[in-house]
Amino acid sequence: MKTDILIIGGGGAAARAAIECRDKNVIIAVKGLFGKSGCTVMAEGGYNAVFNPKDSFKKHFYDTVKGGGFINNPKLVEILVKNAPKELLNLERFGALFDRTEDGFIAQRPFGGQSFNRTCYCGDRTGHEIMRGLMEYISKFERIKILEEVMAIKLIVKDNRCYGAIFLDLKTGNIFPIFAKATILATGGAGQLYPITSNPIQKTGDGFAIAYNEGAELIDMEMVQFHPTGMVGTGILVTEAVRGEGGILYNKYKERFMVRYDKERMELSTRDVVARAIYKEIQEGRGVNGGVYLDVSHLPNEVIEKKLETMLKQFLRVGIDIRKEPMIVSPTAHHFMGGLKINERCETNIIGLFACGEVTGGVHGANRLGGNALADTQVFGAIAGKSAKEFVENHDFNNIDAEEDVAKILEEINSLKGDLNVYNLIEDLRKVMWDYVSIIRNEDGLKKALEKIDEIERNIDNVKVNGIIDLQNYFELKNMVVVAKLVTKSALYRKESRGAHYREDFPETKEEWRGNIIIKGKKMWFEKLDYSVFQNFLE
């Protein structure tokens, strides 16, 4: 199978990239079902964009880098804030509908860490509406083909040039290559590394791992965001829109505890601060049933029914009417700020390999602001598509083949004759990550985590594979181990606390650590960021 452009992923970034290169032959290869898997369709809160004349790009830029602990890539942040409004209007052109004010302007709500109400929304199902519009528009173009239920297990890279990827067909178990002149990774994050996550089952870090295995540079992998509010036990997201509309957090003593952690911003502090606050309340015995209360019962019923409709239905399914009683919430693994290192054209250090969305690092720094992720998918999805389209104008397949790569994979599969249950190993890995590499970290725990991850890795070859599901779990476990090591080693390397990365043995934020940890192969290094690079964009 050959194509001009191969897009791996099925969320908002992948869809927007496909639209941008719609006049080329495009294959969107999706691990799940297009539009029904991935994180975009599940995103509830909103899309940040500057529309109000009293707001500004500088304010959005500053909020983003301040929230990100001043280790964001300032060039990428500038691109994000300046292009977000245009891409939101493109979404409306594609068919998505955003809520409007009575005067006809795009409605905007407050979100955490922002100095202005700039989060555009469609009730509390914004991501679903965005995907609906993107899919509707994509359906008009015959040159965009969609291949569902296929998992990328290896990139085809020769002499640092990417020529596509090798896939596992999740319906048949077949292994097959797709050759492409340009490849775009839009595979999202790795929330499934943790037992409590807002992410869907597809998010096992595949893009991080298959790119790293071929020599891609990754950045900020220690920065994993835990959304402050997930449903207790399941981790299912309770959108930030709940707090944006006036939701109040309090503990079992009915104390509004955020006053102890951020007296000024309270419930609308940045996600890292709120998540640690909730975690601390629970750990110190002030929680309730493993969480804390989040209450909107003081809001008018019509506000809840219109602006928090999804949340109302979500909790009614478990017997809780949020119009009358509080929710119980706790932190849930949510977003990877780190990922593939890209430039302003969404190029990686591998020629012909582009990346966009959550699989990339640099945009959000040490902590992502709510509402910036959906904007990220559209802004950088468009850029990745444009860059890939320009690349294929001057590059061909170069008579490449993947017979040897496919043969090695088949040999690897045939050698799996052990007796260990692969899913049990996945569960073991998740427990290790939650216990030692989650909201609060320390050196002893991180070192213990590495030992346990190494032990799990040694056992991978001893698993039994009985059918396609086991085979999928096997490749996912391999990827998850790679990503777990990247996160843990980076967290051990950064001897400070910044954003989502909190070291209780190094609780202070240190100026000498204002910069980025980069990993390529067995090498890891630190690149300092001078504060002046941010000042240049704020003048």
UniProtKB/Swiss-Prot annotation:
Please list the cofactors this protein needs.
FAD
What Gene3D superfamilies does this protein map onto? Answer: FAD/NAD(P)-binding domain, Fumarate reductase/succinate dehydrogenase flavoprotein-like, C-terminal domain, Succinate dehydrogenase/fumarate reductase flavoprotein, catalytic domain
Q: Which GO MF term does the entry hold, naming one?
A: oxidoreductase activity
Q: Which family does it belong to?
A: Belongs to the FAD-dependent oxidoreductase 2 family. FRD/SDH subfamily.
The protein's name? Uncharacterized FAD-dependent oxidoreductase MJ0033
Please give the SUPFAM superfamilies that the UniProt record associates with this protein. Answer: FAD/NAD(P)-binding domain (SSF51905), Succinate dehydrogenase/fumarate reductase flavoprotein C-terminal domain (SSF46977), Succinate dehydrogenase/fumarate reductase flavoprotein, catalytic domain (SSF56425)
Which InterPro entries does the record associate with it?
FAD-dep_OxRdtase_2_FAD-bd (IPR003953), FAD/NAD-bd_sf (IPR036188), Fum_R/Succ_DH_flav-like_C_sf (IPR037099), Fum_Rdtase/Succ_DH_flav-like_C (IPR015939), SdhA/FrdA/AprA (IPR030664), Succ_DH/fumarate_Rdtase_cat_sf (IPR027477)
Keyword annotations of the record: FAD, Flavoprotein, Oxidoreductase
- Top-level taxon of the source organism: Archaea
Q: Does the entry feature the keyword Flavoprotein, yes or no?
A: yes
- Whether S-adenosyl-L-methionine counts among this entry's keywords is no
Q: Where does FAD bind?
A: 6-20
Transmembrane regions: none
The UniProt entry annotates the active site at H227, R243
- PANTHER family in alphabetical order: SUCCINATE DEHYDROGENASE 2 FLAVOPROTEIN SUBUNIT, SUCCINATE DEHYDROGENASE [UBIQUINONE] FLAVOPROTEIN SUBUNIT, MITOCHONDRIAL
